[in-house]
């Protein structure tokens, strides 16, 4: 049964997050003539991307623009930037997302500065079942005016994961002592060569993490050492090697392969010191920086540094969904049917199958996780896949089950990956 058969059509669809996937959901709803409201926590659209706007994506323009959004934009004379060019996050916002959000069909439906803190059913906690599917959703949000509540016929949560990093500690909990050194620990993807340059120049930075966010920061720090020779770099990983970063013979995406080769070369040249098999348990403050306490090969060890960059990946904020009936994989916290397709122990970006609404459903009819948040803790998210998700979800909301069930995404033979996006 589709949503239009159960829920009041007079209510809008609520989209949480005005990043690329949230705006793509809106574009698809525009084409289907369905009312919606986007609730964005930041003061501007794409607030998470703006924080790492200096970082260049691995994927070219032709793979990072949603088809429905492109149709709406091209109707106004907009042109796709150089299809093979690789945009930075800032260029993605300036040349695509801002023009999209400014369209008459979207602009008046976007509310910024609205932090959704909880989603439930109106008058129902998660234990009540009778007439649940036909009861509107209720969103509670914090705004500049205070706490407000909104109702919706369906909810698409595209709020991303960038604001919710994984722990530095191997336990998954914040390391002991973190509160004492927060001023010396940076979030993933700091702007080392731009606004954050003074913080890192001439200092010893330890980058923690084994993915491409870590690699991008390592490369930026290496470039900084050429201008500020006193700058030192340590790369701390908990496994024996950083398999997602190091060069692979079968890597088909040139930009991503280049990162692996460049990091390998810097390590070989001794410009990046690698400390492997280090599991962090505690952080302590020193006169000049941070002391990292951990276990390495079964022995207690210490590592001193001026600054720490936490590039350990991200996790979804599920606390806001406590009253929603979710069915999540117990390991990666993705929708149960999607999880086997994206398990990072099995799949890379190039092997994740396209999927539609059926893989994204929960026991809560009309509620969907989409975009980066739908991948839980898996690091293999593709923007193109997020666009396909919301195309299918919005078709289901419209009652077009045939379109919702069809897979329209045609992935190229090689991987198509984005850096972190909301």
Which residue stretches match the model-derived regions?
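Glycine-rich active-site loop/strand segments that organize a redox cofactor
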Residues: 42-96, 188-194, 235-254, 365
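C-terminal, flexible cofactor-proximal segment of oxidoreductases
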Residues: 2, 311, 315, 321, ...
